[in-house]
Amino acid sequence: MKGIILAGGTGSRLHPLTKVTNKHLLPVYNKPMIYYPIETLMKIGIKDIIIVTGREHAGNFLNLLGSGVEFGAHFYYVLQDGAGGIAQALSLTEGIAGNESVVVILGDNIILDDVSQQVKDFKTGAIIFLKEVHDPGRFGVPVFGKTGKKLLKIEEKPNKPQSEYAVTGLYVYDYTVFDRIKKLKPSARGELEITDLNNLYLKDEKLNYAVLKGPWLDAGTFESLFESSKVIKDVLSKK
């Protein structure tokens, strides 16, 4: 099993900071943002990690992270030219991931739960991780059946969310993920959407979900970047 960190994008919501570096290299409390998804994957036991990023600041990632030896890991780097969506960025890793299952995490997502058991138990299909939030309409939102347990579909940033849960930026996929991505069509904004990929798995009754209990931080805006630093500081002070 390989880990994949998607760390591309322009980081426009964090301008002007991201004019000089990739947002995933910005500090969150006492370390660069990208260290957190690396730690999430390492905690699971994954040491082969593919990092997808844009061409402009790729050298900064290499200078900071190197080969991965300092982490006890092996890093692979893949360049994404332009913005084609999360699923498109994921597709670029096929040549390295091969026929293995993958754990995918967005580079600006900080997840403090230990999800190693869910990954250890994973056999086939896909897993998404949900978190109850006060503003689900900013994210992909799961729609459940009458019992509130059976997952019916996932809606991308709905105006009227049908649940209080958000789909976080942590996913587990089996080896069929790349063939499924090839079946996707660009959305209205011209991108291959991760929500469409997850719905493909759901259509085949191969999508499971787990609910995160601990903090989930999306550090992609100034407000959330600041809040993430506060939460990390509080967590560390209690250890």
Over which residues does each language-model region extend?
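Short alpha-helical oligomerization interface
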Residues: 19-24
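A structural signal for short hydrophobic beta-strand segments in well-ordered beta-sheet cores
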Residues: 25, 142-144, 209
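Conserved donor-nucleotide/metal-binding helix-loop-beta segment in metal-dependent transferases, i.e.
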Residues: 113-138
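Conserved N-terminal catalytic core of the sugar/cofactor nucleotidyltransferase
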Residues: 2-5, 13-16, 27, 31-106, ...
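A short acidic, often aromatic-flanked loop/helix-cap motif at beta-alpha or helix-coil junctions
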Residues: 82-86, 135-136, 160, 216-218
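Fold-independent oxyanion-binding glycine-rich loops
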Residues: 8, 54-55, 80-81, 106-108, ...
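Catalytic-core segments of class I nucleotidyltransferases/pyrophosphorylases
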Residues: 119-120, 150-239
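Short, conserved catalytic or adaptor-binding loops enriched in Gly and charged residues
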Residues: 66-72, 143-146, 200-202
